[in-house]
Amino acid sequence: MYFRQIFEPKLAQYAYIIGCQKTGEAVVIDPMRDIQQYYDIAEKEKLKITAAADTHIHADYISGLREFAERGVKVYASDEGDADWKYEWLIGSDYDYELMKDGFTFMVGNIEIKAIHTPGHTPEHLIFAVTDKGGGADKPMGVATGDFIFVGDVGRPDLLESAAKMKDVMKPSAQTLYKSIEKFKSMPEYMQIWPGHGAGSACGKALGAVPKSTVGYELQFNNSLKHATSEDEFVNFILEGQPEPPLYFAQMKRDNKMGPKVLGGLPIPGKTETAKLGDFQGNREVALIDTRGREAFMNGHLKGAIFSPLDKQFNTTAGSYITEEQPIYLVIDEQDLEDAVRDLVNVGLDKIKGYIPVAEYEKWLADNNAAVAIPHLDFEKAGDKLLSGDVYVLDVRKASEFSEGHIDGARNIPHTRLLDRIDEVDPEGKTVYVHCSAGGRSAVAAALVQRFGHDVAYVDGEFDNWFNKEEEVAG
């Protein structure tokens, strides 16, 4: 049996290629949208991808299942859950597909894949137990757990309500998840766990960075599973302190259910003339993404630009600050373009119209005296203002962080929800001072606040260190 885990660091997502080396066939489990990467691996290993399967309708990225279906690969999707949780683009189509209920099995060469229904994260969620029958095994080696069991955590049951805006489903989903965990506890302790996400994903609150585990280890040391001693205890624990989901999650659920647009490959855009920048100035109908570093952006950028640097949060920021209808232009150098495009289409942002190289962008700003800046202060310099009431304090940390300590009078809007709640920012003529815990989230949020016409200052540095000192002085 061939096994390969493929990690996408910006979304902390794991996909899997599992192949039968005797027959040369392979399946891809939970593929992302850019499926060429899986073909490249399969070709190198002398395997042919004959199947692809999703554990569930994903909320955090566009699935590659339809891309595989377009290429004639047989795809497997859940048929659990009610009518709201069906793959509408697939059912009744001309694609080669099978719909799976609990206990459904299919073969990839001599490898058996068995679907097990584990609702809770979503109603239709399946996990896949993998048995290497060609190697003589009659019991599963491991299980691809999707967003059900992670290393150190379990899949959050609140997303249907907090992201997809369904009403009164959070607690029932948590209760259902508890029942699925009871089923999980009966699995052999030796079985390997191959999760759908790792540390950095918003699909849980305490995911580990170790890529694999075992059933036995997780039953002993997974904190969420340790709280599954009773339904009430588990429900209370799992619903407390979940991070606010990025704004694009609701769109991903819809697109993966109804059918994402078929790409057929990455849509690499051409270069845009700098003369177009004049049309983009202050134009919120267009999304100009400035991917430069923080200092360069704060010192000077086009009015209305969205700040989304090329770091691990690029997908999250872009997906939370840009709508799918907006045409996108990138301030970026050509060598970084392909990766940025891949990141954007992974979260359903397909309307990428062009790019402007950094040097040409900066020259145009200087030649046209068009650069605007955002004042940049640390907590020591901004402290008196933050405490004075003379400025509007916007705290873009998570609600759980805010509850542990915050500036009196501060407005808390987590940065991934800021676009949806931007009308709540009402400074009444005051400058908006934006802060988070260490400066990363507040930097991108300050740019968004400025994009909507407010005077803004960006506060950098370690909030907790400064805040604790202020409390000591006050005490």
Task: Give residue spans per PLM region.
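Histidine-centered catalytic micro-motifs
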Residues: 52-62, 117-125, 193-201, 434-438
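Active-site metal-binding loops of divalent metal-dependent hydrolases
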Residues: 31-32, 57, 80-81, 121-122, ...
